[in-house]
Amino acid sequence: MYEQFGGLVDQNAKTVTFQLFIPDGERAPSQYEGGGLPRIKDVSVVGSFQDPAHRRWDLAHPVLMTASDYVDPADGELKGLVYAHTTAPLPDGFYEYKYFVRFENASPRLITDPCARYGGTEQQNSGFVVGGHVETVRPLAGHRLPFSDLIIYELMIDDFTSRVRHPNEAPLETVVRKLDELVRLGINAIEFMPWTAWAYADDPGRDFSWGYNPVQYFSVSHRYTHNPSTETDKLVYLKRLISECHNRGLHVIMDGVFNHADAAPPDRGFPYYWLYQDPADSPYVGNFAEHAFFQDLDYANQCTLEYIRDACIYWIDTLKIDGIRFDNTLGMYRPGDRGHGLPKLLAELRAHLSRTGNPNFSLILEHEWNYSSVAVTNNVGATSCWLDPYRSLSMSYLGDRPAGFPQVEPPIMRMLDSGRDFDPGRAPTTYIENHDHQRFMRKAGGRTFWYLTQPYIIALFTSAGAPLIYNGQEYGADNDMPEDGLGRVVPRPLDWDWLLEEPGLTVFERYRQMMEIRRAHPALRSSNFYPRGWDESNGELNQHGFGINRARNVVVYHRWGDDGQGHLERFYIVLNFSQQTQHVSFEVPNDGPYTELLSNMVVSPSNGRLNVDIGSNWGGVYYRKS
């Protein structure tokens, strides 16, 4: 429904039709249970379209919009009012606009468009484009892979492109130029940090954001689409980027922030907050569940669900994305309530995906930073959740060093059994680093101590789920970041020169090799793990040689599964987190031989056991196919 609203351009007629929808809780009570009326007297539109030759706004003469009842064609129900106006034909170009809203008993407000497709250059204006190139997103080459087959690269568009951007190039164009390097690394999916428009200051030097303070859910940020050499190509750059990803077999996952909105001052905050005379009456905003952040969206009300659902469907259908990461879903989820919030939203999205023949679409949660997120993933029908204990425990073992050196502890066994408790068809997103926390290499002590990270890299790519790395991790970026405060969300441009020198070259090769091994062996993507259910008071290997030897900083585990051709693959993984070479012995079920995949050395058992020496801060992946 909401995809029909906004500033929609008829490229043949060169006109734009503005449509602003306001639900009516009195005449359409199904739209919301909590909230009041907007108390709007009338709505006008102002913008650079008023004087297209000079792109001047005429605030003294706002263009009055016509109000009429809106009946949803999907169900024939009255939903509220729509305010509309169609312009005369306009010259090609990029135009900006806002709604001028007068209330019954409050000062008028200039408010941005909640359904605009473009963010503006300043003051959180909305935008539209007349003319320019037309692009249709090309589908993914081949077929969309099951989630566990993905190797994900988390990409922050600004930091990724800042130091390699050409003068007359939009940041989204720069990403396209770097895609082949990511393919060489071995990933097959990119999770883009939010590209939707956020609230920003007028000072161009202060409009940096990670994107987790959204205001317009249908809109791509002007910062990412701006090419100084042309004004008519904007959204086309995002479409081309997704097409170029798809041409290379790269899945595109959108990071969606649907828990909250930024209610900055009226002229630039979340429109559906400020479209109400008393913003407290907005049915779109309210504390639905725990974890209030900015202004929480109120999923107790149908209008909120429909707005966010339709925004998701817009990105799915029009931009052909392959998955959505749902940021901070704590505020969208009430345990036991399947009729509202996250369960209802995902149910309606799954229904749409089924109707449109859209298989293997990823629905990924960021929920609790503990194992309780697994049960929520199962309960709401998501594909995956970010399994943050994988990061937090790895960070702790690497960096805390109570005795002066990295020390693993028995809870690592539950961490490595990352696929545990997920329903069939669901799996974790595993990582040792992401945008939200300090760099893993920094925790190691900096790039000089890169070798300390090696057993964790081996673990990540031999665990169940879809492994994720954060941009720059592949060559050992080690910039610091506080966990909170003003120095947290600031630019941290990637230094691509680090990829051309040591230790960046070696670190890159470690990640590339482990990704290659994972792609070549489907059984590593299964959930099978031994020893499962490890007693976390036990710091000794079991009688078969598996588990953790805390005193020697050694871990041994077994993974297995089908190779995709009906053959059994077995993997025996040994991780040495210590500063000395360690001798390890563990049982295997046959006479071998076994290939150690990191070195390609062939070893054979003796008396039913493999006896191996593993170098310090290193590991072994012993493989045999039946």
Predicted segments, located by residue:
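N-terminal carbohydrate-binding accessory modules
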Residues: 23-25, 121-154, 167, 198-205
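Aromatic-rich carbohydrate-binding modules that target alpha-glucans
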Residues: 20-92, 102-124
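Non-catalytic, glycine-rich low-complexity segments
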Residues: 1-38, 141-142
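C-terminal beta-strand-rich structural cap/linker in extracellular carbohydrate-active enzymes
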Residues: 606-626
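Substrate-binding/active-site clefts of carbohydrate-active enzymes
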Residues: 143-144, 156-323, 328-358, 362, ...
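Active-site-proximal helices and loops of the catalytic beta/alpha 8
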Residues: 40, 212-213, 248, 317, ...
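Asparagine-centered strand-capping/turn motif at beta-strand->loop junctions
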Residues: 574-578
